[in-house]
Amino acid sequence: MAGTRRKSLQNRQVGSLLIFLCISVGDATTIRYSVAEEMESGSFVANVAKDLGLEVGKLAARGARLVSEGNKMHFRLHRKTGDLFVKEKLDRESLCGKADPCVLHFEVVLVEPLQSFRAEVRVFDINDNAPVFLNKEPLLKIPESTPLGSRFPLQSAQDLDVGLNGLQNYTLSANGYFHLHTRFCSHGPKYAELVLNKPLDREEQPEVNLTITAVDGGSPPKSGTAHIHVVVLDVNDHVPQFSRLVYRAQVSENSPNGSLVATVTAVDLDEGTNKAITYSLAQNPEAILKTFQIDPQNGEVRLRGPLDFEAIETYDIDIQATDGGGLSAHSKVLVEVVDVNDNPPEVMVSSVSSPLPEDSPPQTVVALFTIRDRDIRVGGKVTCFLREDLPFVIKPTFGNSYSLVTDRSLDREEVSGYNITIVAMDTGPPSLSAETMIEVLISDVNDNPPIFREDSYILTVRENNSPAVFIGKVHAEDLDLGENAQITYSLLPPKNGDLSVFAYISINSGNGKLYALRTMDYEAIQDFQFVVKATDGGFLSLSSQVTVRVVVLDDNDNRPMILYPLQNGTLPCNDLVPRSAEAGYLVTKVVAVDGDSGQNSWLSYHLLKATDLGLFSVQRQNGEIHTLRQISERDPMMQKLIILVQDHGQPALSTTVSLNILLVDGFSEPYLQFQDPTKHSRKVNPSTKYLVISLVILSFLFLLSVIVIFIIHVYQKIKYREKFTIQEHFYDDCNFSNNLVQGQGNGSLSRPCPYEMCSATGTGNSEFRFLKRFMPNFPFPHATGEIKMEAGSSLPPNSDRNKSQRLEGHDQVSDDYM
C-alpha cells in the first residue's frame, strides 16, 4: 500500500516538473534543457532541430549524432523528426549524488560540413528518497547524575535527495526527560541532539525509550525513524574533557591508507574504571566511517580509505570519548583535503573527417575534440598541442572544446596519411599529460601530370624492316593514384609541312610501345621526329608531351657507282702513258660513290685483273693508279686493267670498271717531271695565252673538217661532264691540226701537268710537242678549267688535287673526262 502511494506521489512530482520543462539557448553554440529524474525511457525532452534553427530533414542528411562527455549517453536523437528522447530512466542520485545542480553535458555533431553544438540537460530532483537512519536502534548510556541541559548528539539521517526534497527536520516522541534540538553542519547533513530536561533517576526509571523521526521537505514529505534506547547508569561524577572542542587537520588526497590525520585527547577526573577513556567514531555518516578510523586507546585518527578532492573537499568527523562509567564527551575533527595534481587531462574526440582531400584549403576542420581535467585548483589549467610538426593546428572553439584544422596545403604524393598525436598537459605541479592519436588519410586529387622518364627519346630502326616491327617504347609516370594515374598514349598530328607520322608510326595507347607501319628506306629518309602525348585518366585530365626522334639505320643495299671512267660501252676509255714514265707515275684515278652512309659508303679499290699485274698498282684508299716500275719497250702498247671497287658493308658489295691504258712514245723527257702547280703563280702568263691562240688559229686553218668533228665530240662529252658536276672551260677559238686531239694530262690527274699531248687519230703513232712561247704577253679572256669532286669522293681529305688550278703557260683541258 505504501509502495503504491509512493509511486503515485512520484508520478505527480514528475508531472509537475514536466510542466516547468525549460528550454533555453544560452548562446549561439549551447542549448539547455531541463528534465525531471525518473522519467521513463522514451520520454520526450525537446525538438533539437527547432532549437538549432535547422530544417528537420537536414539532421538526417548531415548525419546528426549525439556525443557524450561522459562514458554513457542518456539521451537519443530521432534524426527524422529532430526530437530528443530519454534513452533510459534517469536517477539523479546515481548520476550526480549530492551535487546540485545535476547537469548532463553532450554535443550535437553534424557532418558535411563538420559542425557541433554544445547541449546540457539539467536533471531536477524529485522526492523519491525518504530519510534513513543507518542505526535503527541506537543505544545511549547516560549516568543518572547527568546535569540538566546536557546534550547527546544523535546519528544524522541520510537522505539522497537534495534541496527541499532533502532532510529538513527531526522530531522526537513525547517523553518527560528529553527534548530535541536540531543542529546544522556546514559540511554535512543536519543532525539532532537530545537535551536533558529533567534529572534522571535510575531507581525510578532505569531505561527510557524514544522514537526520533527525520522528515524531508518534499510534497508530500517523506520520513524515517529510529528507536533510541536510553540506559540510565549509576553515578559517575565526571565526564571526559577534550583538550579542544574542534581539531583541524589537512591531508593530501594522495595520502596512503593508514596515514595519520590527527590525534585527539580527553581526560576524566574520576578514578578507577570511570577514568578509563575509549575513543570512537560513533555518530558519523557512512562516508566518514569508510574513510577514517580511530584508535580507541590513543585517539589517533587515521585514513581507512582513499581521499578524492574532486569528490569531497572537507570532512566533519564527530569524535566520542567515553569513560569507564559510561559518560561521554564529543569533539569535532575538521579534515581539509588538500588537492594534488593526480588526474591527467582527458582528450575526448567527438568527430573526425577522414579521408581528407589533398586539395582541401587551409583552415579546413579535420576533427572536433574536448579536453577535461578533473583537478580543479591544482593543474586545472590545460594546454594542448601537436607532438610533431604537421600541416595541422589546434584552434579553440568555446570553453574546453577545440577543433583541429589544416594549416597549409596537403600533398598526398608526399604524405598519404597522418597519425596526429594530440597532447594535453596541465600546469601541475607535477605536470601531467595525456595523448590521443587521430588517424587522417589523404585522398588523391588529380594534380600531377604524367612525367616522361626522358626529356626526349631517340629510337633506331634499320632500313628494309618488316612492317609492324617494334622499334621502342616511351614511358611516363603519374604520381597520382588510381584512375588519376592511368596513362593513355597518343601521337600528335604533325605541323604543316612535316612528315605525316601516322603513315609511318603507330603507338599502343596502353603501354606506349611504338611500331613501324612501313618499310623504311635510309636513302629516302634518314631520320624523322614526332610528338607523343601522355594523358592521365583524371576528371580534369592532365597531359604532357615528349619528342621522339627515329633514326633510320643504313643497310648496305647500294653498290658502288663509278663516276670515272665512264662505262658507256660505246667509246673506249683510254689513258695515255709515255713509255718514258718512271715508277710511281700517276696514270689516272678511278672515282666512285656509294649511296649508303657510314662504313657502308667507305670504298676501297683493288686491281682485279691486268695485262701485266707487275706494271700498275691501285691505291686502296683513293683509287689512284700508278706505275710500279719504269715502262720498257717490251711492254705491250695496250694495257687493260679491271678495277674492283668494294664498300665496307656487311656483306660487302662491289663494282668493277675496265680501263685501257696506251703506252705511247714521243713525250719529251724533261717535261715528264712532276711539277707542283702550287709553286706557280695563280695568274696565267699572257705570253702563254698568245702562244695558245696562235696554235689554235693555225690548226683551224688547216684542219677545218677535223674541228667540226671535234666540236661534235666535245659537245657530247660536255653533256657527260655536266651530269657529274665536273666543269670544264674550252677555248672558243682554239684550232688544232686536223689529225690532232688536245687533252689535259692523264686520266683523273688532279694536278695539271704543263705538257700537251697530240695523238694522231688515224695511226698508232703519237707525238709529244712542247709549245714554246712565240708571242708577246697579253690578257686572255677565258678562265682555266675546273674539276669539282663530290663530297662522297674517296680522295684523301688533305689533298689539294680537287681544287681549281691555273696553269702558267697554257689552259687545262681534260680529254679523260670527256
Curated annotation (Swiss-Prot):
Keywords: Calcium, Cell adhesion, Cell membrane, Glycoprotein, Membrane, Repeat, Signal, Transmembrane, Transmembrane helix. It is a single-pass type I membrane protein. One of its GO terms (cellular component) is plasma membrane. The chain crosses the membrane at residues 692-712. The keyword ATP-binding does not apply. CDD domains: Cadherin_repeat (cd11304). Residues 713-818 are cytoplasmic. GO terms for biological process: cell adhesion; homophilic cell adhesion via plasma membrane adhesion molecules; nervous system development. PANTHER family: CADHERIN-87A, PROTOCADHERIN BETA-1. This is Protocadherin beta-1. It comes from Homo sapiens. The gene is PCDHB1.
